[in-house]
A protein has these predicted regions:
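Ribonuclease/tRNase effector modules and their secretory precursors
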Residues: 1, 19, 91-95
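C-terminal structural segments of small proteins and small subunits
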Residues: 70-114
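N-terminal first-folded block
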Residues: 2-50
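Glycine-rich nucleotide phosphate-binding loop and flanking beta-alpha elements
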Residues: 11, 59-61, 115
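Intrinsically disordered, low-complexity and often Lys/Arg-enriched segments
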Residues: 1-2, 116-119
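Acidic, metal-binding active-site segment of PIN/NYN-like and related structure-specific nucleases
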Residues: 46-63
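Small/polar loops that bind or transfer phosphate-bearing groups
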Residues: 5-6, 54-55, 77
Length: 119
């Protein structure tokens, strides 16, 4: 199980995931795919049977059109700080990984704070 971190997420998340959860993770820039199209990235991830962590809904559409693999972790919490995203993933990622291990192809991670609560 390897997680590819899409370009609109901080590449630092990859190292944090490795250090925090002991799961292989790599930023797309580090494997030469930072400037790839969504389709190119999706097909490369399909070939490698990886997990793509992304904020981009295009990956959800590609998954619907082309099927898994890859599996998708879809981050829908909007713009947020790296610190807040790490806090959110620190809580959610164990359950997300369990769902993926159980065969889910798409898991959405969102911030369910009440409106107006500060991040």
């Amino acid at each position: 199980m390897t997680i590819w971190i899409d370009a609109q997420l901080s590449p630092a998340l990859a190292l944090w995931i490795v250090q925090t959860f002991g799961i292989p993770a790599v930023a797309l820039r580090d494997i030469g795919l930072r400037d790839g199209t969504d389709r190119q990235i999706f097909l490369a991830a399909k070939e490698q049977s990886t997990i793509v962590m992304t904020k981009d809904a295009d990956f959800v559409r590609l998954l619907e059109d082309l099927g898994p693999p890859p599996q998708i972790i879809w981050i829908t919490c909007g713009n947020t700080s790296n610190a807040h995203l790490k806090q959110l993933l620190g809580t959610a990622l164990p359950r997300v990984l369990a769902l993926l291990s159980d065969g889910e192809s798409l898991v959405e991670v969102s911030d369910l704070r009440p409106k107006g609560e500060k991040r």
